[in-house]
A protein has these predicted regions:
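Domain-level detector for long C-terminal conserved domains
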Residues: 1-133
Length: 133
C-alpha cells in the first residue's frame, strides 16, 4: 500500500505493462493505481507523480493520457501537467524538449557503474509530470 507519501515515481514500468498486458490491461492497472492514490493521499497535500518511460511509438508514452483520464475519473484534480522529452525527432506529442539530453550525473558516476549497470550517458525518455490535488 501507498501510505504517507506525496511523491510517486514510475520508471519504465508503463512500457513493460503496455507490452505484457496491452492497452486494456494497462487501463485496469491505471484505474487500480488511481483508486489507491485516492485512498492513501494525504489530506490537504498535493501529490507529485513523475513517470519516465520509452519515447517511441506504441510504448509507455502513448498510454500517459489513459492515466490522466483515470486520475480525473476517481475525482482528483490535476493542478499541473507537463509532458517533457529529450529527443528532437519522433517525439511525444505535445511535449516540451529539454535543452540538453546529457546525463547530468555523468561526471559523478564511477566507470565501474557505467560498465556494470549500463548507465546511459544520454537521456531519451518521455516524461509525464503531474501535480494532483
Amino acid at each position: 500500500e501507498i501510505r504517507g507519501c506525496n511523491v510517486i515515481v514510475i520508471q519504465y514500468l508503463i512500457s513493460f505493462f503496455y507490452d505484457a498486458v496491452g492497452r486494456n490491461g494497462l487501463r485496469r492497472w491505471f484505474s487500480y493505481l488511481a483508486e489507491n492514490i485516492v485512498r492513501n493521499k494525504l489530506d490537504n497535500s498535493p501529490l507529485l507523480i513523475i513517470i519516465n518511460d520509452a519515447d517511441s511509438i506504441n510504448t509507455g508514452r502513448d498510454a500517459f493520457p489513459l492515466f490522466v483520464e483515470e486520475i480525473e475519473r476517481v475525482g482528483l484534480s490535476i493542478s499541473y501537467e507537463r509532458r517533457r522529452r529529450f529527443k528532437d525527432h519522433n517525439y511525444y506529442a505535445g511535449s516540451l524538449r529539454y535543452e540538453n539530453n546529457q546525463n547530468v550525473f555523468e561526471r559523478e558516476i564511477p566507470d565501474r557503474f557505467v560498465y556494470d549497470y549500463c548507465v546511459a550517458k544520454y537521456c531519451e525518455s518521455a516524461q509525464l509530470i503531474l501535480e494532483v490535488i
